[in-house]
Curated annotation (Swiss-Prot):
This is Mycothiol acetyltransferase. Catalyzes the transfer of acetyl from acetyl-CoA to desacetylmycothiol (Cys-GlcN-Ins) to form mycothiol. It comes from Mycolicibacterium gilvum (strain PYR-GCK) (Mycobacterium gilvum (strain PYR-GCK)). Keywords: Acyltransferase, Repeat, Transferase. Belongs to the acetyltransferase family. MshD subfamily. PROSITE patterns: GNAT.
């Protein structure tokens, strides 16, 4: 195993293939999208475990370590090839991440699978954060709602970014990943193959022209869409914008993905301790289908 600050194109390709193999075997992606985006950059550390099979080296394990950022601790995500498991590779990589990032480092277990729970217990790690994946069919949606003195539009280009950033960073000031965005965060996502301005909805105050909230949708496949981000300016809370924007995006995804008798679902992620949001999404017909858990050697109250 070795730490690397940047990856060659070939190494990044091998890691993507590793992630695909693990996803197929486990039924859940072992790392988040932000890790895949980070493969082309040097903003995180890359721990790579390779095996020489005589025909060349193959990546058998990979860990991404994102450094601490303001109040957010270091974040680690790890994946081991299905054919290379039960050899201690994952445990060794996690130990290396804890040594590199410190005891407050969070190690994500996507899906919190049995093997991940056993590894966490063996390493003496404690669950410190839970992220719920909720899902519902894109059928029989609740009717769309409106909000008074609000104009809805779709994203029209980078000149909208300043207002999107203002609302996003106000709405998610508490969030370790979603808060503190810059122009680069939007530009990077705008360059992703899935980006579609027609699925990026904005709500403006009719009187002042200020952005009040937004709903960014994402299409993963012909059968799965996502409520990617819903953000409402805290100063505009209480006007029904969250529900109106969410339903606007859901109906857009239904129209895009369920034509010609096709069947599709929509999913989202929400913090488990955000009970108000969880209740809201349950009222909209979402159910919990998966849980991602962050483990750490030190509980938050001890940091």
């Amino acid at each position: 195993m070795s730490w690397q600050q940047s990856l060659t194109d070939d190494r990044a390709r091998q890691i993507r293939e590793l992630v695909s193999a693990a996803s197929a075997a486990d039924g859940v992606a072992p790392v988040g999208d932000q890790v895949l985006r980070a493969l082309a950059h040097d903003r995180t550390r890359h721990l790579v475990a390779v095996e020489d099979d005589g025909a060349g080296s193959r990546v058998r394990g990979y860990l991404n370590l994102a450094p601490a950022d303001d109040d957010a601790p270091p974040m680690a995500e790890v994946v081991v090839h299905p054919d290379a498991r039960r050899r201690g590779t994952g445990s060794a990589m996690i130990r290396a991440a804890l040594a590199e990032g410190g005891p407050q480092t969070r190690v994500w277990a996507h899906g919190n699978l049995v093997a991940a729970r056993a590894t966490a217990e063996a390493l003496g790690l404690t669950a410190v954060r839970e992220l719920l994946q909720m899902q519902r069919p894109l059928a029989d949606l609740p009717p769309q709602t409106t909000a008074q003195r609000v104009r809805f539009a779709t994203y029209s280009g980078p000149h909208d970014d300043a207002e999107v950033l203002r609302v996003n960073n106000a709405a998610f000031s508490w969030h370790p990943e979603q808060g503190g965005w810059t122009d680069a965060d939007i530009a990077e996502r705008r360059g992703e193959p899935w980006f579609d301005p027609a699925g990026f909805f904005l709500a403006f105050d009719e009187d002042t022209g200020a952005l009040l909230g937004f709903h960014w949708t994402k299409v993963h496949s012909e059968s799965l869409g996502e409520v990617y981000v819903v953000g409402v300016d805290p100063a505009a809370q209480g006007r029904g914008l969250g529900a109106a924007l969410t339903l606007l995006g859901l109906h857009h995804l239904e129209s895009r993905l369920t034509g010609d008798g096709r069947v599709a679902d929509v999913m989202l992620y929400v913090e488990a301790d955000n009970t108000a949001a969880v209740k809201t999404y349950r009222r909209l017909g979402f159910d919990i289908v998966n849980t991602d858990v962050a483990y750490a050697a030190v509980a938050p109250t001890d940091v």
